[in-house]
Structure formats: structure tokens, C-alpha cells
């Protein structure tokens, strides 16, 4: 077997990835397929933390643009991430992988509160952890939450799994001639406003020298990224 490049990673998933063809809500069949991908990664023996968005259920920024109070909209979006986290937890545990959901907003009846030292201990014991409810604060995206948890938990890399194979010069779902970047620097990504993650998340990764790997969430790409095979786009320093 190939040697793992990373021992502990944070995996960022979009909420839309759980919706499947229905585009909204949680599709159990899609969740099952996604968890099969995650299972193959977990079985490598590395420590894995997940951050999942909530856009399949509610998008705070979109609601704010239509007149809803921004803080209220963002809190609703955070609650949506908890629903997604519980769906992933249930499916992973049915596959035999002990999983803990840790929420930045206290709701002890359904999940644990996010406490950094507790999260680290779960990882050390071989449990998958899912960090839910973003940062617990409005005005911060789940991309920023992913970068923050990545630093706090001392992960070796931040992997963003998407519906496409990496980062392109234009939307590959709309343009057949779109070209994929294999490598980008943090500076280039910020300067060219390449929409990998929001600028706060990229800056956090840059300041802490954490590579960001963007790859497809299916077809074994996450596993190949762990093994250092660079299946998508890697963003790092010079």
C-alpha cells in the first residue's frame, strides 16, 4: 500500500453534496455513497475531522440578501449544518466507524459541545469527529470554520471535496474547455480572486502553512489525496 502523506486531516464538505439529484435536503442514497468514500479513507488509519456546510437546507447569505437579519440567517445556517452532521454520523456508525458530532452551539441532547481538548482526544482514540454549527458566530462561513478547526486540531492538511475534480480557470460544468490548475499559491489564489474558499479561510491556511487540496468527493479522489497522489488542485506556499 502507498504511504500516507498525512496523519491527520480536516475534510470540508459542502452541504449540497448530501442533496444528490434532488438538489435540496438530504438524500439517503447520496449520503451512503459519500460515506463509502469516507470509509475507505478512515480504513487507512489516519485521524479525520469533518466540517460540513448547510447549503442544501438553508443558506444564510442568500436569506440575508432577501431582507432577513444577517445574524438570524447565519444562525439558521449553522443549525442546518448540525442536521447534516447527524446524517453523516448515523451512516458512518452503521459502517462501524465511531463518530462524534461536536457543535459550536450547545445542544447537548443531540451532540457534544465543541471543546478543542475533547475533540483532540476523540481523534487520538481513532474516532471520526464532525465539527458542526460553523464557528458558532454569525458572519463567518463554514469555509472559515474549516480552516479554524484545521489549525486548532493541528491537522496536516485541509481537503475540500467538491462536485468537480479541482480548481478550474472557469466553471467546468458550463464550459467544456475549462482547464484545471494542478498547483496554486496562496498569493495567486487571493490576488486572482479564485473562488476555492473565502479569503479569510485561505489567509488562515497561508499564515499557518497548511496546504489546501481541492478534489472530487467521489471516485476515490479523497483517498488518493491522502496518499499524496494529487488528484486535484493543491494550494500552498511558494
UniProtKB/Swiss-Prot annotation:
Q: Which biological pathway?
A: Pyrimidine metabolism; CTP biosynthesis via de novo pathway; UDP from UMP (UMPK route): step 1/1
Q: Which Pfam families match?
A: AA_kinase (PF00696)
Q: Name one GO cellular component term.
A: cytoplasm
For this entry, list what GO says about its biological process.
'de novo' CTP biosynthetic process; UDP biosynthetic process
Q: What class of enzyme is it?
A: transferase
**Mechanisms controlling activity:** Inhibited by UTP.
TM spans, by residue?
none
Q: Which InterPro entries match?
A: AceGlu_kinase-like_sf, Asp/Glu/Uridylate_kinase, Uridylate_kinase, Uridylate_kinase_bac
Indicate where this protein resides in the cell: Cytoplasm
What SUPFAM superfamilies does the entry give?
Carbamate kinase-like
What EC identifiers does the entry list? 2.7.4.22
Q: Can you tell me which residues bind UMP? A: 54, 74, 135-142
Q: Give the domain of life.
A: Bacteria
Where ATP binds, per the record, is at: 12-15, 55, 59, 162, 168, 171
Give the multimer and partner information. Homohexamer.
Query: What is this protein's function per UniProt?
Result: Catalyzes the reversible phosphorylation of UMP to UDP.
> Which HAMAP family is this protein grouped with?
PyrH_B
Identify this protein by name.
Uridylate kinase
Task: Report the source organism.
Answer: Lawsonia intracellularis (strain PHE/MN1-00)
Amino acid at each position: 500500500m502507498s504511504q500516507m502523506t498525512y496523519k491527520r486531516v480536516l475534510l470540508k464538505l459542502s452541504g449540497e453534496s448530501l442533496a444528490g439529484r434532488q438538489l435540496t435536503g438530504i438524500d439517503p442514497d447520496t449520503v451512503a455513497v459519500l460515506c463509502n468514500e469516507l470509509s475507505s479513507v478512515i480504513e487507512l488509519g489516519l485521524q479525520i475531522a469533518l466540517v460540513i456546510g448547510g447549503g442544501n437546507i438553508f443558506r444564510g447569505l442568500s436569506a440575508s440578501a432577501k431582507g432577513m437579519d444577517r445574524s438570524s440567517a447565519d444562525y439558521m445556517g449553522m443549525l442546518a449544518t448540525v442536521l447534516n452532521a447527524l446524517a453523516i454520523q448515523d451512516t458512518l456508525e452503521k459502517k462501524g466507524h465511531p463518530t462524534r458530532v461536536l457543535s459550536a452551539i450547545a445542544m447537548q441532547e443531540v451532540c457534544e459541545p465543541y471543546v478543542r481538548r475533547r475533540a483532540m482526544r476523540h481523534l487520538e482514540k481513532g474516532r471520526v469527529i464532525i465539527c458542526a454549527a460553523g464557528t458558532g458566530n454569525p458572519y463567518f462561513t463554514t469555509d472559515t470554520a474549516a480552516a479554524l478547526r484545521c489549525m486548532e486540531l493541528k491537522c496536516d492538511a485541509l481537503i475540500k471535496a467538491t462536485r468537480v475534480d479541482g480548481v478550474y480557470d472557469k466553471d467546468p460544468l458550463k464550459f467544456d474547455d475549462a482547464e484545471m490548475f494542478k498547483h496554486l499559491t496562496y498569493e495567486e489564489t487571493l490576488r486572482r480572486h479564485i473562488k476555492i474558499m473565502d479569503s479569510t479561510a485561505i489567509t488562515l491556511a497561508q499564515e499557518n502553512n497548511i496546504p489546501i487540496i481541492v478534489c472530487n468527493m467521489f471516485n476515490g479522489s479523497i483517498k488518493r489525496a491522502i496518499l499524496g497522489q494529487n488528484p486535484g488542485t493543491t494550494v500552498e506556499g511558494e
